[in-house]
Amino acid sequence: MQQLQSIIESAFENRATLTPATVNHETRDAVTQVINLLDSGKLRVAEKIDGQWVTHQWLKMAVLLSFRINENQIIDGTESRYFDKVPMKFSDYDQTRFEKEGFRVVPPAAARQGAFIARNCVLMPSYVNIGAYVDEGTMVDTWTTVGSCAQIGKNVHLSGGVGIGGVLEPLQANPTIIEDNCFIGARSEIVEGVIIEEGSVISMGVYIGQSTKIYDRETGEIHYGRVPAGSVVVSGNLPSKDGSYSLYCAVIVKKVDAKTQGKVGINELLRSID
């Protein structure tokens, strides 16, 4: 794996000169191998190591290189044709392979090659971009977008129209992460490498980026870029110091543990916020 990483990093340093015509076989083979490993879930752009999320920047480099070294090509769909550098993930799947990998794909859901979909997932008409990792038992509901390299945990529900931000450039940026057992309400947007920690519930229409204030009403603490585990979050506003205006924020209205979440439905958690 170290050799593969070295090839990718060296090629990325010289990416300005790379084209489909000039790329050498070693680089092309390395990029193809990485995309296939991402596609199968054997590699992932980010993973939790000793309780901390670690981003493997060289894998993002490989994804970016794939755009430089591949020509656009015709992609056949059920109702149209497409023209792009990245093949669709399911273009060569047959019934046997779908049954073996154990997830459902409802038309016209789309996933690009290099995205991993684990067992018992359901893709309603949605979009999963290259480098994304969707773990077991997750529902990706209608019109949801899972951005490039985003990391979605086990037993997550991404409700209708949710946007999970992608990140390929700038290279140093970290992917957006939704940890296990989270619920993201309809039309919410989680972007810019924000981490939603395990067991959190995000209400409908909540927008969180790196600059969004995440206000804990119980403690008065303000978080940035991270929703603590077990938080129930709704949209809100915080007043300016002089009281002349207010600005949007996300409000942590309560904390719940796994036991409570198991006994109480999501709707109940969101309704009883007073």
From Swiss-Prot:
Tell me how this protein assembles: Homotrimer.
- What is its pathway? Amino-acid biosynthesis; L-lysine biosynthesis via DAP pathway; LL-2,6-diaminopimelate from (S)-tetrahydrodipicolinate (succinylase route): step 1/3
One protein family per Pfam: THDPS_N_2
- Catalyses which reaction(s): (S)-2,3,4,5-tetrahydrodipicolinate + succinyl-CoA + H2O = (S)-2-succinylamino-6-oxoheptanedioate + CoA
The scientific name of the source species is Photorhabdus laumondii subsp. laumondii (strain DSM 15139 / CIP 105565 / TT01) (Photorhabdus luminescens subsp. laumondii)
Q: Name one GO cellular component term.
A: cytoplasm
UniProt protein name: 2,3,4,5-tetrahydropyridine-2,6-dicarboxylate N-succinyltransferase
Q: Its domain of life?
A: Bacteria
Q: What is its main location?
A: cytoplasm
Q: Where in the cell is it found?
A: Cytoplasm
> What are the UniProt keywords, alphabetically?
Acyltransferase, Amino-acid biosynthesis, Cytoplasm, Diaminopimelate biosynthesis, Lysine biosynthesis, Repeat, Transferase
